[in-house]
A protein has these predicted regions:
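Flexible helix-coil transition and linker loops at the boundaries of alpha-helical arrays
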Residues: 58-71, 107
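Bacterial Sec signal peptide processing site at the extreme N-terminus
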Residues: 24-39
Length: 128
């Protein structure tokens, strides 16, 4: 007799979600951003990075032609990518993404993240 635990139920739900989502996210930056956030919240950093990078790829053309909502999606994707890179310890990549996010959608969160990453890089350089 097999007994499903809550772990098994969550695993089955996650697998069903992952099987259903790829078809829904085709060329839809907002859905890739949402999926990246979902992965990041669950600690699936590599998967989150792939989704945030896909948003960037989908908007790889002339960003000056983007609508306001698209600017926000792209800026958020770069910010989240910077956060994901910090979780991997990839500080230079994180700094580049945070700066890119600030260029697209300047705000306090981006500015603060850039400052924190700069401090971390300086501490690492001083410790070596």
């Amino acid at each position: 007799m097999t007994c499903f635990t809550s772990y098994h139920q969550r695993l089955i739900f996650t697998l069903c979600f992952l099987l259903a989502v790829p078809g829904c996210t085709k060329d839809n930056p907002q859905r890739h951003l949402n999926l990246g956030n979902w992965y990041l919240q669950r600690g699936l950093v590599d998967e989150a990075i792939m989704e945030f990078r896909e948003v960037s790829r989908l908007f790889s053309g002339d960003v000056s032609k983007l609508k306001r909502k698209e600017y926000n999606i792209l800026g958020t994707a770069h910010l989240k990518l910077a956060i994901a890179y910090t979780k991997k310890g990839w500080w230079e990549y994180a700094l580049n993404e945070a700066k890119r996010s600030f260029e697209i959608t300047p705000n306090k969160d981006c500015h603060d993240l850039i400052s924190l990453i700069d401090e971390k890089i300086a501490l690492k350089a001083g410790g070596n």
